[in-house]
Amino acid sequence: MTEPLDAALRPKSLAEYVGQARLKEKLGVYLQAAKGRKEALDHTLLFGPPGLGKTTLAHIIAAELGVNIRVTSGPAIEKPGDLAAILTNSLEEGDVLFIDEIHRLGRVAEEHLYPAMEDFKLDIVLGQGPAARTIELPLPRFTLVGATTRPGLITAPMRSRFGIIEHLEYYTPEEIGTNLLRDARLLGFGLTEEAAIEIGARSRGTMRIAKRLLRRVRDYADVAGEKTIELERAQDALDKLGLDTAGLDERDKKYLETLIHRFAGGPVGVDTLATAISEDALTLEDVYEPYLIQLGFIKRTPRGRVATAHAYDHLGLPVGAAESDLGLYTN
């Protein structure tokens, strides 16, 4: 599946978007009000784990408003000149500017963004030293949609300039299944509801992962000469992909087993845990831990990470299991 096809499968309206019910309801009100007043939507910050649809929602916002969208990312805007080029050359009245990973925006560029967000003007410095002068460029009234997986890294001045701040939640297996059935229909292959929900249940509550898994399960079905993906085929393919019934892969299980085995279930600091499993701390915090916390398998405490009774149960271990119970790291 190519990138343009991925874009073609995206929902084009709030009505087509499955999940995030509370967010959809609120966003629908904000969009309707903005259209009724013929105003740009307030600047919007969307945050949550990767793959939950922040980019898709940004495109939906633009589509619902009937305006264009300009897509960029925080790391791509290093200097004020980068920002000026986007704001002065790419945007028309009411357009949406989507900045992914906005927490990685350069600090100087961020400070130049403040007057653009508040007063729709951009201050440009011409020349250097005593001869330098500042000119003020008017900008069209636009909507900035920022997306981040790390809201704690958004500075207070930046956060205060967003009129709408919303968190995206993990999806239920049923919500993911509904979306996958739509994808299968658009792509012209069969998928039963039971198989779709099974894929959803092993997708970490994340739509992006579910779509990737659907492609891989479809590969297995195609090789087997099956035109429709049934539950048994989905289960078999997902098992071969190394995903258990909760959607945990080998890295997730290594995290839990290391926490329980090497550190007696915790508490242990994230840096120490990351070193023990040959991973970096940011990857643990951004990729692995959100879902493990969502499942109730670990807790983040002031003293470090702690495995819960649910984690022991999922691994088939008694709470407080000894090293020999895991059969790992033994001589």
Curated annotation (Swiss-Prot):
GO annotation terms (biological process): DNA recombination; DNA repair
MF GO annotations: ATP binding; ATP hydrolysis activity; four-way junction DNA binding; four-way junction helicase activity
Task of the protein: The RuvA-RuvB-RuvC complex processes Holliday junction (HJ) DNA during genetic recombination and DNA repair, while the RuvA-RuvB complex plays an important role in the rescue of blocked DNA replication forks via replication fork reversal (RFR). RuvA specifically binds to HJ cruciform DNA, conferring on it an open structure. The RuvB hexamer acts as an ATP-dependent pump, pulling dsDNA into and through the RuvAB complex. RuvB forms 2 homohexamers on either side of HJ DNA bound by 1 or 2 RuvA tetramers; 4 subunits per hexamer contact DNA at a time.
Keywords per UniProt: ATP-binding, Cytoplasm, DNA damage, DNA recombination, DNA repair, DNA-binding, Hydrolase, Nucleotide-binding
Organism domain of life: Bacteria
Gene assigned in the entry: ruvB
Matches recorded under HAMAP family: DNA_HJ_migration_RuvB
Region (Large ATPase domain (RuvB-L)): 1-171
Gene Ontology CC annotations of this record: cytoplasm; Holliday junction resolvase complex
Pfam families membership: AAA_lid_4, RuvB_C, RuvB_N
UniProt lineage: Bacteria, Thermotogati, Deinococcota, Deinococci, Deinococcales
Annotated signal sequence range: none
Chain residue ranges for the region called Head domain (RuvB-H): 245-331
This protein's name: Holliday junction branch migration complex subunit RuvB
Residues where DNA binds: R300, R305
Free-text comment on this protein's domains from its UniProt entry: Has 3 domains, the large (RuvB-L) and small ATPase (RuvB-S) domains and the C-terminal head (RuvB-H) domain. The head domain binds DNA, while the ATPase domains jointly bind ATP, ADP or are empty depending on the state of the subunit in the translocation cycle. During a single DNA translocation step the structure of each domain remains the same, but their relative positions change.
Subunit description: Homohexamer. Forms an RuvA(8)-RuvB(12)-Holliday junction (HJ) complex. HJ DNA is sandwiched between 2 RuvA tetramers; dsDNA enters through RuvA and exits via RuvB. An RuvB hexamer assembles on each DNA strand where it exits the tetramer. Each RuvB hexamer is contacted by two RuvA subunits (via domain III) on 2 adjacent RuvB subunits; this complex drives branch migration. In the full resolvosome a probable DNA-RuvA(4)-RuvB(12)-RuvC(2) complex forms which resolves the HJ.
NCBIfam families the record matches: PRK00080.1, ruvB
UniProt-annotated binding residues for Mg(2+): T55
EC class name: hydrolase
